Swiss-Prot record:
Disulfide bonds: none annotated. Belongs to the CbiD family. Its EC number is 2.1.1.195. It comes from the Bacteria. GO terms for biological process: anaerobic cobalamin biosynthetic process; methylation. InterPro entries: CbiD, CbiD_sf. It comes from Alkaliphilus metalliredigens (strain QYMF). Pfam families: CbiD. This is Cobalt-precorrin-5B C(1)-methyltransferase. GO terms for molecular function: cobalt-precorrin-5B C1-methyltransferase activity.
Length: 377
């Protein structure tokens, strides 16, 4: 596929989804059910509006059935499913139905909260629609087929995806709302993160612990003994996950994170990646000045190389009260973002000093977590 996008000054190639692969393989197999020859290329339309012409691989015929594969091409996206063979086998039915099944390497949904019912193969609604539309167009209204989608290496690759955490067992998911993989797409990561909220709510989780990454997760586990099922790694998408929490009617959120990440939220920055905004030293300095710190300390913090260095300078001058002030400010900003619909607390830490501060609500949320029985004793 030769379409490109420019990101951060780099020319990156688009790819196509597992859903497009499954659709193309199914269409090619349907064409070969109706004719004796082999189909070596197949065209499909994607929801994005782009047409794809894909090479058909590993054609196998048996009485009343055809199987073939399409090789997944993720373009320049770092996708663990890249180069996987996505197979579709079509078998004539006696009626006019089209039934789509999951075979080897396609996961099975085991927990509620996803778009797919428990017990069904992890083939998302858009790919299901794409497959049925393309196959029906080929075979017409008067015939029916069973379609089995399989991914021979899917079970192994699935261990590197979100699937185990989402309760999808035994393989990968057949995905793709647009049919196209946009390289280095934040939207794909956001979609995965957003899935975790309804799934946890389906398991009666009421108090969530948001951590930006592994450091926050480790602190939550080791210091506060918080169970993994309550934790969601939100990466840099603080604002997005707050918005999703409102949509999902989340009751309570405790945020646990490194000061270098969360101090940005105190300044109203809800996407915390450095390419979007930084301002860490400036925010620290502004709040120090507001609390009456000396000009010398403010200037030294502005000139510091890292947040860890700034924390050391602040503690050296006995200005530790800044940290509880910041924790309260982070909470205040998140409450404003969620329009007061969610009870929120914040805990901030540094790598060298450990926990720096709890906001005024954090202790209450820790007690609620304990009373809900989600902390390991």
């Amino acid at each position: 596929m030769e379409r490109y996008i420019i990101k951060d000054g780099k020319k990156l190639r688009y790819g196509y989804t597992t859903g497009s692969c499954a659709t193309a393989a199914s269409k090619a197999a349907a064409q070969m059910l109706l004719q004796p020859g082999e189909v070596h290329e197949v065209d499909i339309d994607t929801p994005k509006g782009w047409s794809l012409k894909l090479k058909v691989e590993d054609i196998q015929r048996s009485h009343g059935a055809v199987s073939c594969a399409i090789i997944k091409d993720a373009g320049d996206d770092p996708d663990v499913t890249n180069k996987l063979a996505i197979y579709s086998k079509l078998i004539w039915r006696q009626d006019t139905k089209i039934e789509i099944h999951g075979g080897e390497g396609v996961g099975t949904v085991t927990r509620p909260g996803l778009q797919i019912p428990v017990g069904k193969p992890a083939i998302n609604p858009i790919p299901l629609q794409m497959i049925e539309r393309e196959v029906r167009e080929v075979i017409g209204p008067g015939r029916g087929v069973d379609i089995v989608i399989s991914v021979p290496k899917g079970q192994e690759v699935a261990k590197k995806t979100f699937n185990p955490k989402l309760g999808i067992q035994g393989g990968i998911s057949i995905l793709g709302t647009s049919g196209i993989v946009e390289p280095m797409s934040e939207e794909a990561m956001k979609d995965s993160l957003a899935l975790e909220l309804p799934m946890a709510k389906a398991e009666k989780i009421k108090t969530f612990v948001f951590v930006p990454g592994n450091y926050g997760r480790d602190m939550a586990r080791e210091k506060y003994k918080i169970h993994d099922k309550n934790m969601i790694k939100i990466s840099n998408f603080v604002g997005f996950m707050m918005d999703q929490s409102v949509i999902q009617n989340v009751e309570r959120i405790l945020i646990i994170g490194h000061i270098g990440k969360l101090v940005k939220v105190a300044g109203g920055i809800f996407h915390t990646h450095s390419k979007v905004a930084d301002g860490r030293r400036e925010i620290l300095a502004a709040h120090l000045a507001a609390l009456g710190a000396s000009q010398q300390l403010v200037l030294r913090v502005l000139e510091s190389n890292t947040t860890e260095e700034a924390v050391g300078l602040i503690q050296e001058k006995g200005f530790d009260r800044l940290f509880s002030h910041l924790a309260d400010k982070i909470t205040e900003k998140c409450v404003e973002r969620t329009q007061g619909n969610i009870e929120i607390g914040t805990i901030i830490f540094s790598m060298e000093q450990g926990v720096l501060a709890h906001c005024s609500q954090a202790g209450r949320l820790l007690e609620i977590l304990k009373s809900e029985g989600v902390k390991d004793e």
